Amino acid sequence: MISMSCVPKEEEGEDTQIKTELHDHAADNPVRYASLESVYSVSSSSSSLCCKTAAGSHKKVNALKLPMSDSFELQPHRRPEIVHVYCRRKRRRRRRRESFLELAILQNEGVERDDRIVKIESAELDDEKEEENKKKKQKKRRIGNGELMKLGVDSTTLSVSATPPLRGCRIKAVCSGNKQDGSSRSKRNTVKNQEKVVTASATAKKWVRLSYDGVDPKHFIGLQCKVFWPLDAVWYPGSIVGYNVETKHHIVKYGDGDGEELALRREKIKFLISRDDMELLNMKFGTNDVVVDGQDYDELVILAASFEECQDFEPRDIIWAKLTGHAMWPAIIVDESVIVKRKGLNNKISGGRSVLVQFFGTHDFARIQVKQAVSFLKGLLSRSPLKCKQPRFEEAMEEAKMYLKEYKLPGRMDQLQKVADTDCSERINSGEEDSSNSGDDYTKDGEVWLRPTELGDCLHRIGDLQIINLGRIVTDSEFFKDSKHTWPEGYTATRKFISLKDPNASAMYKMEVLRDAESKTRPVFRVTTNSGEQFKGDTPSACWNKIYNRIKKIQIASDNPDVLGEGLHESGTDMFGFSNPEVDKLIQGLLQSRPPSKVSQRKYSSGKYQDHPTGYRPVRVEWKDLDKCNVCHMDEEYENNLFLQCDKCRMMVHTRCYGQLEPHNGILWLCNLCRPVALDIPPRCCLCPVVGGAMKPTTDGRWAHLACAIWIPETCLLDVKKMEPIDGVKKVSKDRWKLLCSICGVSYGACIQCSNNTCRVAYHPLCARAAGLCVELADEDRLFLLSMDDDEADQCIRLLSFCKRHRQTSNYHLETEYMIKPAHNIAEYLPPPNPSGCARTEPYNYLGRRGRKEPEALAGASSKRLFVENQPYIVGGYSRHEFSTYERIYGSKMSQITTPSNILSMAEKYTFMKETYRKRLAFGKSGIHGFGIFAKLPHRAGDMVIEYTGELVRPPIADKREHLIYNSMVGAGTYMFRIDNERVIDATRTGSIAHLINHSCEPNCYSRVISVNGDEHIIIFAKRDVAKWEELTYDYRFFSIDERLACYCGFPRCRGVVNDTEAEERQANIHASRCELKEWTES
């Protein structure tokens, strides 16, 4: 035990001497304990800091060094300092200051000032406080005695020290009744810990719901969130990445890469945020006061108040019902006579009066006590039932609201009540042993809960045919339809017909359309009797013919005439219901329907609703080269191989690459995955994990990318002209399936390897294309020599691919540094001195009013370009206050121009573009060069932006105008657009603002020639999604072997020149000198 005391400060030498004496004393005669008075008293002879150890103990405790006080020699102008031990002394009352004479007398008498103070303060204590201090001291002594006994202190010594010493009394008096040293110290530690907890809780991030009232919508940008989808019962994580001012929707990007615009008030969203961030962003915790799971709370209260008339519960009243172990749920009271024949529900429960209810949303029946039912209005006002977070609660609230508005139950609820009161319920349950013993029935003290049977949940009833499930349209196989009818997969229906056991009785038959498990492409028709016997066939008639034959044998054996007459002669299609006009209308409606829930196709393709093979993980690629073919990855367009663009997914393909032999004649074209008869769930490629793209079916019923089928050696196309189906998937080497892609890291699919002989790097073909690796043809020029009409077997081109390390770079691109040097030299150009002397005395030259001539013009433009930023020209009214360019551009409110849904042809799309381009585009100062064009509204990838118009001239005329006229017009520029070798558009003096679009090596637009009503037009298309107020650019591809134009786009992948270097390189390889030509001779 370490004892501490207040000692006067000594000199450094004395301090050293005290330490030595302590150690010497402990070594010669170890002391087991010491009197507390000797420890705490300053006047004690052993005025030292002692360290006591038990005999035989090896544990050593180092003594703490306390600050030593000065000598107690009295000084005329300074009093001795009092050292406080363990506790902080409160401020004492002011007392009379002793004179110098009194202090001298006290010193002569041998009484120290500290002792006198202690005695005076001890005398001032009253009796009550003294008793209180004694009780606290006894408590402290009990605690301290245990610690001393552990250190080996004798119990007799403890009794001696029971009387509180003077120093202890002084501490008590000075502290004015505070807690003991240890307790005060623990209290301070507790306060510190509480402060740490409060600080940690304030900075710790938690998932909470926030309020949107009085908060800037832009404050939510950057916050992590998770969105609850009720129909999936899943929280999807994501983050807020933007805010649309026009629609007032926030842009949410999910963890799987998908994004959508949401109104946060209408969704169930939680944010990951701390208290400090909430205070910084001026946010508050959200509640369900305004909107309750999509339902207007005020409207529900008004409807419930107008609906509720009496206090007692009666049939058809809407209530809140509570089942044990379940949340309160909206329900309707059902008449007792409705389900009097249902087993279990007609039993009276103990505990008083009971009511029969049916729940909204789940449509389950239950019998509960009256005390378990709450008025619907009372429940809404208390808000306690509205805290339910189950996915079906929102659906139940919608049905309850509809019932309050129209006083009409959903069709399924009404039908179940009718079925329960008829023999239909007994027929439905005839295949079961006993409905009361089924797992769907629930009975507990005071309540009975019965779920409706599965076969009773029929969607449509047409005569004696009950359709339970319509199924889904199959588009990956042509065998699920014939010339007259379509057979949806999963179609389920029931019908009453002659029983196989008793010809005089009737039974229920269940009919289904399934997929063959072996072939996976053909349907299987199955009919199941109430006894469980099944009849299968490849057509509906094949199934029912087996049943007809069985019935005929039974009738012949029993000498019973045909009961139903012509009933046995109806076809299987009639028995399934496919020939019924109403059923056919329902099936045709499936072709145009989409999933009605919030679960979109991207969530299906993301892997949450598909049974993916082991190792599969979808890979989504944001293609930057939208102007290139998705199959061959080339951007050239030819007269016999035009481009096609899907109007829905904006994918670009060549007609030959996709196998589109029939011309589309100006009609908007859709790919196989975007057509109305396409799959509800986009199929995945069986050769790679990349989602989307140009896909075709395989011979084994799956789908694959055309690019994957071309690059993988084992696969091929059975019909090269139609580019389908893909064959040879099963012939792919097993070792190729085991390769791991070095780019995406997904083990799913078949990979190719680097063409270098010593390299074994593997990757998927589309992953390599997205990563920018060299995936090209060995002899690309030979591709144009191939003929599609000739079916020659030797028409093939070798395909090469190289990894990042071995990719072949062209030496022609190394001249980029040399190309930009002349522009640097021009920027450093210094104008020559004026030959006429001082320029201020020179008359104004009207011939030079358009600016300085070359090279002064280029030098000035190069230096000025360093300080120019994009500044669109915005037409606005007079304003007294000045606004920054950012506020004028990004703070303006422009209405979004939506594309009409009735556009069905390219001509209508072209007309809409011509009518709206003035509202969508604006010109202004460009940071690249001169003036430019800016988008006032966002544009989607593939949208028509503007038409390039001007004067149509021949190439020789264009060359003469450019060299003789336009080159001398400094500041005017030249705007020549070459269509082909015979036509050039001159937009210098005539045309639209499209000629102001600048060049960029990484453009966001591209140009295409389209045909509208027999006329050709040059259209600028959006290559990717163009943001608001973004400058429009496209690649000029200036073709000239001798002349080089410097590029100032400033993008990281800038090639330094405006010239099309690849085309010039190909052109240089084609041309050869005359001396290199050889005379051609026939062999």
Swiss-Prot record:
Main location: nucleus
Catalysed reaction, written as an equation: N(6)-methyl-L-lysyl-[histone] + S-adenosyl-L-methionine = N(6),N(6)-dimethyl-L-lysyl-[histone] + S-adenosyl-L-homocysteine + H(+)
Region called Extended PHD domain (ePHD), residue ranges: 682-807
Ranges for region Disordered: 422-443
C2HC pre-PHD-type zinc finger segments: 682-715
Residues involved in S-adenosyl-L-methionine binding: 929, 975, 998-999, 1036
Pfam families, per database record: FYRC, FYRN, PWWP, SET, zf-HC5HC2H_2
InterPro entries per the UniProt record, alphabetical: ATX1/2_ePHD, ATX1/2_PHD, EPHD, FYrich_C, FYrich_N, Histone_Mod_Regulator, Post-SET_dom, PWWP_dom
Compartments where located: Nucleus
This protein's name: Histone-lysine N-methyltransferase ATX2
Source organism: Arabidopsis thaliana (Mouse-ear cress)
